[in-house]
From Swiss-Prot:
Subcellular location: Plastid, Organellar chromatophore
Main location group: plastid
Family of the protein in this entry: Belongs to the universal ribosomal protein uL14 family.
GO CC entries: cytosolic large ribosomal subunit; organellar chromatophore; plastid
Species for this entry: Paulinella chromatophora
A GO molecular-function descriptor: structural constituent of ribosome
Keywords of this entry: Organellar chromatophore, Plastid, Ribonucleoprotein, Ribosomal protein, RNA-binding, rRNA-binding
Protein name listed in UniProt: Large ribosomal subunit protein uL14c
Length: 121
């Protein structure tokens, strides 16, 4: 579960390394899960890239440490909290996605992120 002030790793090559959640988008929501969109501030970034430190960006969560229950009864959990930075059209800013992503992103119409990911769990 991701909430305000949570730090996340960035799982793409947009230039940001770590972001901090400012707000979970949605009607008065407190927690975000896989596939939810958040507003975040870039806390650590690589030089000479499109995303700079202290930029405010939108991101979609692709991995969480919290257990994710599926309708089949399976549960899945990742080693870190990670997000992919997106633009206003819900397309990723980077051209690569690192690490596995959850299958729930396909159901939420983030097919571009799923196609860029090396592994979908």
């Amino acid at each position: 579960m991701i909430q305000q002030e949570t730090f996340l790793n960035v799982a793409d090559n947009s230039g940001a390394k770590r972001i901090q959640c400012i707000r979970v988008l949605g009607s008065n929501r407190r927690y975000a899960h896989v596939g939810d969109i958040i507003v975040a501030a870039v806390k650590d970034a690589m030089p000479n890239m499109s995303v700079k430190k202290s930029d405010v960006v939108k991101a979609v969560i692709v991995r969480t440490k919290a257990t994710l229950r599926r309708e089949t009864g399976n549960s899945i959990r990742f080693d870190d909290n990670a997000a992919v930075i997106i633009n206003d059209d819900k397309n990723p800013k980077g051209t690569r996605v690192f690490g596995p992503v959850a299958r729930e992103l396909r159901e939420r119409n983030f097919t571009k992120i799923v196609s860029l990911a090396p592994e979908v769990i």
